[in-house]
Amino acid sequence: MKNRYIQQFEDAQLKDKVMPQFKAGDTLRLGITIKEGEKTRTQYFEGVCIAIRGNGVDKTFRVRKMGANNIGVEKIFPFYSESLASVEVLRVGRVRRAKLYYLRDRRGKAARIKEIRH
């Protein structure tokens, strides 16, 4: 059970940031703000959301993409991170699992996720 004051502080933090609705299996395009000395720039990371865990301020999601030479790259992002400039849902995937860790073992066409057509 959290302290009442901690809960009020966390609720105030959550009000500021609005995130789009997405789930595991969706393809996301994340804009990450990177500060290098005096300059700031936005770097984009595009991949499949393979897991969402936690709740409240501690909620995180894991995104996986295939990098150069077919090397898988996974990054974990806090939902309410200040470094996330933008989150865009590119495709809505059709999966039956909440955690898609089995995609780590798949290669090529076997690693694809079916898209929900509207």
UniProtKB/Swiss-Prot annotation:
Keywords: Ribonucleoprotein, Ribosomal protein. InterPro entries: Ribosomal_bL19, Ribosomal_bL19_CS, Ribosomal_bL19_sf, Translation_prot_SH3-like_sf. Belongs to the bacterial ribosomal protein bL19 family. It comes from Helicobacter acinonychis (strain Sheeba). GO terms for biological process: translation. The lineage of its organism: Bacteria, Pseudomonadati, Campylobacterota, Epsilonproteobacteria, Campylobacterales. The keyword RNA-binding does not apply. This protein is located at the 30S-50S ribosomal subunit interface and may play a role in the structure and function of the aminoacyl-tRNA binding site. It comes from the Bacteria. This is Large ribosomal subunit protein bL19.
